[in-house]
């Protein structure tokens, strides 16, 4: 099953609050300290911090590192580091040597580790045999690279709901489609836009449709395979921003039928500073190098412009690469490949449903959404507390409850502003703040952590 399929099957439902003494979906005891939250909560509650359980144990390489007592509900910004990543880095550190630049044993080992990492990440993403897997710094870097590789005269189609990383790198004449009201409407909008762009042409101009797999604001999943099919019907290509989808569900380029995929290591339980652009080789090999310098060249002559650029990933990876980042990311990819991802997904969906149910019941809290309330989504929820400044709420959650989450417009200003306006209409509240809060969960998240947030939201100031 592809990531989208998994996303589709995992619809959030509204469960009953857990009974005291019961187990959460990961088999951890559900906190009995926090009472189920409802709109009719008594006026006074104990504000003392609730003890937080450790991350669920027993998954070995996919245990996440963290600081005891700190509740990380900000996985969508940066996920904690998985043990697999930390171990891979620790193992390689004594072998520290140059990559692609030395004949010594250390250097050869590092070069091999780097190229193996490329292979493993490519396998994880289900690349086709002739696709390139290019290491970048992050998703932003990957999408900027793809923008630079657009053939001349190429057009881009995207949605106003995208993260800035998938809005801003594209040419100024990019078609930015309005935020659709449903997954089906998104597919229809792409179809209509491409028909319009192709009208009166011979259909050969390059067009790229670039869309996210899961929204960083709402967690909602986009109909990736259907969008890619719509693009291909019109002879266009499809780029998937999988920064938020890949940490939660399988992303397989071949199965989804997409042409390019971009991910960030730091959202995939690996360290900062590594990302990937994977996909069709032809545009990438024809484009000027994204970075110029050592490693991107085949030959350099005496004259300034006498340069033969390399083909393949090296063309866009000038300079000494981020070996440890690549190896750490590959280790996480391997660990994720060898576990039952459907089970992980189901566990996360149950926790997400608990979080959303609690948020829906908390006083004055309004959730943000683009599609219907039951549309498939990954472990991300954005919301506002009516009458409260979101930055102040976030600061209070951090200071008083040791809960880390995100506030603001989440680098998706057009979407976040629109959803805030819609939330005001839907809730009938005139006192919604101009920015939002976002809670996001993943591998190390527990019911107790979610309950702590719900308890904090239910506690009067
Ligand atoms: C959907 C989406 N795309 C792209 C990005 C950019 O990722 P990075 O900051 O790792 O480049 C993010 C980051 O939050 C994101 O959520």
Where are each of the predicted segments found?
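Pyridoxal 5′-phosphate
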Residues: 4-7, 23-461
């Amino acid at each position: 099953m592809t990531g989208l399929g998994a996303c589709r099957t995992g619809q959030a439902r509204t469960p009953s609050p857990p009974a005291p003494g019961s187990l959460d979906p990961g088999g951890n005891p559900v906190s009995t300290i926090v009472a189920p939250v409802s709109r009719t909560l008594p006026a006074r509650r104990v504000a003392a911090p609730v003890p937080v359980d450790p991350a669920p144990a027993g998954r070995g390489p996919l245990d996440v590192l963290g600081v005891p007592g700190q509740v990380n509900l900000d996985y969508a910004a940066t996920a904690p580091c998985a043990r697999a990543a930390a171990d891979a880095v620790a193992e390689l550190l004594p072998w520290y040597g140059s990559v692609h630049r030395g004949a010594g044993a250390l250097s050869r080992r590092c070069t091999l580790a780097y190229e193996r990492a490329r292979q493993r990440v490519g396998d994880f993403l289900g690349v086709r045999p002739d696709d390139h897997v290019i290491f970048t710094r992050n998703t932003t870097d990957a999408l900027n690279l793809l923008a630079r590789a657009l053939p001349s005269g190429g057009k881009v189609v995207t949605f106003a709901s995208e993260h800035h990383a998938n809005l801003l790198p594209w040419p100024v004449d990019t078609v930015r489609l309005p935020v659709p009201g449903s997954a089906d409407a998104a597919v229809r909008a792409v179809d209509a836009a491409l028909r319009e762009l192709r009208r009166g042409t011979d259909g050969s101009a390059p067009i790229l449709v670039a869309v996210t797999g899961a929204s960083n604001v709402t967690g909602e999943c986009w109909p990736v395979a259907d969008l890619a099919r719509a693009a291909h019907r019109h002879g266009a290509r499809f780029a998937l921003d999988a920064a938020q989808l890949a940490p939660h569900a399988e992303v397989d380029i071949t199965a989804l039928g997409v042409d390019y995929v971009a991910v960030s290591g730091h959202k995939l339980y690996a360290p900062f500073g590594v990302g990937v652009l994977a996909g069709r080789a032809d545009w990438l090999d024809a484009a000027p190098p994204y970075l110029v310098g050592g490693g991107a060249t085949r030959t350099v002559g005496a004259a300034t412009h006498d340069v033969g650029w390399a083909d393949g990933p090296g063309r866009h990876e000038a300079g000494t690469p981020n070996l440890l980042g690549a190896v750490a990311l590959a280790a996480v990819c391997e660990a994720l490949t060898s576990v039952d991802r459907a089970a992980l997904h189901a566990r996360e969906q149950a926790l997400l449903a608990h979080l959303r149910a609690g948020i829906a019941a908390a006083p004055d809290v309004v959730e943000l959404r683009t599609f219907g309330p039951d549309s498939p989504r990954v472990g991300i929820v954005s919301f506002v507390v009516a009458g409260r400044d979101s930055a102040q709420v976030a600061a209070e959650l951090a200071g008083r409850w040791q809960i880390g989450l995100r506030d603001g417009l989440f680098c998706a200003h057009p979407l976040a502003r629109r959803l805030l306006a819609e939330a005001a209409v839907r809730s009938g509240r005139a006192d919604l703040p101009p920015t939002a809060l976002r809670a996001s969960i993943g591998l190390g998240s527990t019911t107790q952590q979610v309950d702590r947030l719900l308890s904090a939201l239910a506690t009067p100031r």
